[in-house]
Structure formats: structure tokens, C-alpha cells
């Protein structure tokens, strides 16, 4: 770590794969085209991006309390962004705990058989399936994480986000759980004066027009830029100055 890196604030982002996937797939955390790096560059900060495909707000709680990267980044963080909630709201044919156990099925032929079966069932049952995480649990995990971060860094600016939209065939294009998740996150954020970024407002035009990733979920770089602009506005609302604009 360079001395310059040690002196600069860090933007600590907890995210699902929407933060680091582009129009053709996943990208390294230092790719300048993804929104976390656009935001960090505009602030002249370092970026600590902690995330994984499929993460919900429950995973953010686990990461914030168990991942040593989060422990190292928090003391010098200038702000924290919770960029999850989308997976919480997507339909899940199986309970999350069971679905995540598929990767551990042995032998390998049986695991492939189970995965293929789940891939067949998911788009067909998604229109009637429950959300992956009940909305009240989404809000509870956000609050637990906020409380833990605020305990260690009282008053640090925190931003949260509302779920994106999708047209993914793998989910039968179903997203009936979004409204409940939006309501729960909004109520929690209002109670704690947390600025919100509505990812739908930033990316809907690109996604619903078919200009995102072919999977129907992830975004193109125009959408990443639009998200970055809304994140910067939310950070300004939380009291974080835009360094380059001030300069």
C-alpha cells in the first residue's frame, strides 16, 4: 500500500454483482467503467468494493462483521454505500439456505443434475415464488449493519439503494417482490435519514429497452454512469463534498 493510498479516504461499498458486472460479464474491482470506481474517482478517494454475485442485505451484514477487508477500510472510510437489495426482491423457488447448498452436492454428476433441474424449475415457478428475503428481514439486516458501522464510526455518511429492474428469462421476467422490498428499505431509510438511490430510475431505460447485459439483469456502461451520478448526488445530500467539482 502506497503512502498516498494510506492518506486518502476510502469509499466503502458493499454490493451484489450489479456493481461490477458490465454488458458482457464480471469485471475486476479496479475497472474504471463500473460505477463504484466512477464515484471514487470523482471524489478523489480510494475504493474498497466488497461484494459477490447473489448477495442480499443479509450477506452485507455478514461481510461487515466478518470480512477483515471491511474492518481495515472502515477506519479511513469517508462514506459507506449499501448497494444491495435487488437480490432480496427477486423470486426464489427454494429457500436461500437450500439453494446455496446446491454447490456442495456430491458427487459432481448429482450436483449437475440438481443444478439443471433448478434451472428448469426456476423460470417456470418464479412468477408465483416468494422474494428471496422477506422485506422486513431486508430492513432488519440493513439496520443491524448500519448500527454496527455507526457504533465504530459515529456519524459516518451512509447511502443505501432501492432495487433495480430486470427482464431476465431465468426469473421468468418476474419481479413482484420489488414493491415490498422498496417499501421496507424506504421506511428504514427515512427513519434514519439515510439518502437513497433508486437504481430503477437510473437503469430502467437501458434494461427495459434491451441494451444491458444479455442476461437481462446486469447493465451496460451507460447505466453504470447513470448510477454513479445518482450516487454522487446522494453522497452530497449526506454531506460528502464532490472534490473535483469543488476544485
Swiss-Prot record:
Spell out the InterPro entries in the cross-references: OctT, SGNH_hydro_sf
Key words of the record: Acyltransferase, Transferase
- Give the source's domain of life in one word: Bacteria
Gene Ontology molecular function terms on file: diglucosylglycerate octanoyltransferase activity
Tell me a GO cellular component. plasma membrane
| Catalysed reaction, written as an equation | (2R)-2-O-[alpha-D-glucopyranosyl-(1->6)-alpha-D-glucopyranosyl]-glycerate + octanoyl-CoA = (2R)-2-O-[6-O-octanoyl-alpha-D-glucopyranosyl-(1->6)-alpha-D-glucopyranosyl]-glycerate + CoA
List the EC numbers from the record: 2.3.1.273
An example Gene Ontology biological process: protein tetramerization
The entry's family comment says: Belongs to the OctT acyltransferase family.
Tell me the function of this protein: Sugar octanoyltransferase likely involved in the biosynthesis of mycobacterial methylglucose lipopolysaccharide (MGLP). Catalyzes the transfer of an octanoyl group from octanoyl-CoA to the C6 OH of the second glucose in diglucosylglycerate (DGG). DGG is the preferred acceptor, but to a lesser extent, GG (glucosylglycerate) can also be used as substrate. DGG and GG are the two earliest intermediates in MGLP biosynthesis.
Specify the protein name. Diglucosylglycerate octanoyltransferase
Naturally occurring in which organism (per UniProt):
Mycobacterium tuberculosis (strain ATCC 25618 / H37Rv)
Source lineage: Bacteria, Bacillati, Actinomycetota, Actinomycetes, Mycobacteriales
Amino acid at each position: 500500500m502506497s503512502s498516498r493510498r494510506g492518506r486518502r479516504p476510502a469509499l466503502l461499498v458493499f454490493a451484489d454483482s450489479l456493481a461490477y458486472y458490465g454488458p458482457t460479464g464480471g469485471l475486476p474491482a479496479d475497472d474504471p467503467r463500473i460505477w463504484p470506481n466512477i464515484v471514487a474517482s470523482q471524489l478523489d478517494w480510494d475504493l474498497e468494493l466488497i461484494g459477490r454475485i447473489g448477495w442480499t442485505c443479509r450477506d452485507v451484514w455478514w461481510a461487515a462483521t466478518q470480512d477483515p477487508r471491511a474492518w481495515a477500510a472502515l477506519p479511513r472510510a469517508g462514506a459507506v454505500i449499501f448497494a444491495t437489495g435487488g437480490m432480496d426482491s427477486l423470486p426464489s423457488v427454494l429457500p436461500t439456505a437450500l439453494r446455496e447448498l446446491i454447490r456442495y452436492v456430491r458427487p459432481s454428476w448429482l450436483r449437475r443434475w440438481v443444478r439443471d433441474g433448478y434451472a428448469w424449475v426456476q423460470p417456470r415457478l418464479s412468477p408465483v415464488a416468494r422474494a428471496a428475503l422477506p422485506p422486513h428481514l431486508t430492513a432488519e439486516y440493513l439496520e443491524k449493519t448500519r448500527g454496527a458501522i455507526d457504533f465504530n464510526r459515529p456519524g459516518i455518511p451512509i447511502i443505501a439503494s432501492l432495487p433495480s429492474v430486470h427482464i431476465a428469462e431465468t426469473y421468468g421476467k418476474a419481479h413482484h417482490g420489488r414493491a415490498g422490498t422498496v417499501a421496507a428499505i424506504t421506511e428504514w431509510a427515512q427513519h434514519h435519514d439515510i439518502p437513497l438511490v433508486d437504481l430503477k430510475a437510473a437503469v430502467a431505460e437501458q434494461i427495459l429497452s434491451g441494451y444491458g447485459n444479455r442476461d437481462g439483469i446486469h447493465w451496460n456502461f451507460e447505466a453504470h454512469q447513470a448510477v454513479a451520478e445518482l450516487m454522487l448526488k446522494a453522497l452530497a445530500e449526506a454531506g460528502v463534498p464532490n472534490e473535483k467539482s469543488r476544485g
